[in-house]
C-alpha cells in the first residue's frame, strides 16, 4: 500500500484501486461505523462520492475501505492556477448547492449535533444558554449538509468530474449552517479574502441573505472550539460572542 497522508489520529493509504483510511484507538467503533453509514447514505443521492466497499478491523485500528478517486483536489487546482480561482470558486459553490438539493432523511440532524457540541464546550453557562437559544431559533430544514465542505474535500478527475469526499460530519438541516462552516474553514486557514468572496458568491447564487449565514457563525465557531486547537482559540472566542452578528 502507498501512504497518501498521515495525521495524528488516522492514516490514509492507496491499495490499487482502493483507498484505505485507518483510524487509531481514539476513534470508537461507533465513530467509524457512523462515518461509513454517512457515506452509504450519501451514495444514494445524486452526488458523486467514493463507493463504500468495506469496514474492517486491522492491526492498527478500524478501517474504512472505499474506491480510490483519481484526480486532484480543488484546493490543489486553485493553488496551481491562481488565475482560475474565480472559475473554481463558481464550481465549488454550484456543487455545494447541488448537495443542498439532496435529501437523506436518515442522517443525523444538525441541530441535535450542535446542541451537543455547545453543551460540551468550555464556555460559561451564560454563553452556552445564549447559543442554545440562538440555535433553537433557527429554521428547520432537511437539506444534506457536508459538515466540512472545503476545496480539499472536492476531487476533480482527469475527465473533469467532481467528487465530494470525507462525509464524516454529514448531517441534515439548514444550509446556512454549512455555508458558515465553509466560511470558517477558509478564515481559519488565513484565506480571509477568499472567505469573503465565497460568502458573497454563495449568498448570491443561493439567494440567501448574508445575515442568515452570519447568524450561524457563533454556533459553528463553538462547535469547532471543541477540538482545542490553541492557534484557533482567539478567533473562535471572538466569533462565539453571540452579540457579534445580531
Describe each PLM feature range.
Residues 37-48, 99:
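Structural motif at the C-terminus of the N-lobe alphaC helix and the adjacent alphaC-beta4 loop
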Residues 101-147, 155-158, 163, 235-243:
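An alpha-helical support segment within catalytic cores of ATP-dependent transferases
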Residues 51-62:
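Short beta-strand micro-motifs within the conserved protein kinase catalytic domain, predominantly
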Residues 60-73:
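Conserved short submotifs of the Hanks-type protein kinase catalytic core
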Residues 181-246:
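Helix-rich C-terminal or lid/interface subdomains of diverse kinases
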Residues 83-110:
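Internal "kinase-insert"/substrate-recognition segments embedded within catalytic cores
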Residues 2-33, 40:
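ATP-binding glycine-rich loop module of kinase domains
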Residues 166-170:
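Activation of the activation-loop gatekeeper triad in protein kinase-fold domains
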